UniProtKB/Swiss-Prot annotation:
It comes from Pongo abelii. This is UPF0538 protein C2orf76 homolog. Belongs to the UPF0538 family. InterPro entries: UPF0538. PANTHER family: UPF0538 FAMILY MEMBER, UPF0538 PROTEIN C2ORF76.
Length: 126
């Protein structure tokens, strides 16, 4: 059986406080790969994308979280929902499919330390 390949949007979050993010669309993503393999791919791909400003290409991303799944409701958060971490944060040892990723899913790629700091004090600078 051929691996299932889908299109997903990865939102690169540079700053939670300043709501600084850039979406990048990936086509042909294999859902049978692990989250860890996908993170490694993203860490190799993002610095090579000349369409992204250098601050986004050179940032220390390390965590993935589901923002939105196709045909489901969206949150009111402008950057990323601070709720349901146990369900929406992707665990590195699971496959993308087992983690709930499907076609047209939007996921966030960010620095976990920045996320924890923002979650403890969710104040935007503008």
């Amino acid at each position: 059986m051929a691996p299932e390949e889908v299109t997903i949007t990865v939102r690169l979050i540079r700053s939670f406080e300043h709501r600084n993010f850039k979406p990048v669309v990936y086509h042909g993503v294999n859902l049978d790969q692990t989250v860890k393999e996908f993170i490694i791919f993203l860490k190799q791909d993002v610095p090579l994308r000349t369409s992204l400003p250098p601050p986004f290409r050179n940032y220390k991303y390390d965590t993935l979280k589901i923002i939105h799944q196709a045909h489901k409701s969206k949150t009111n958060e402008l950057v990323l929902s601070l709720e349901d971490d146990d369900r929406l944060l992707l665990k590195e040892d699971s496959t993308l499919k087992a983690a709930g990723i499907a076609s047209e899913t939007e996921i966030a790629f960010f620095c976990e330390e920045d996320y924890k700091n923002y979650k403890a004090n969710p104040i935007s600078s503008w």
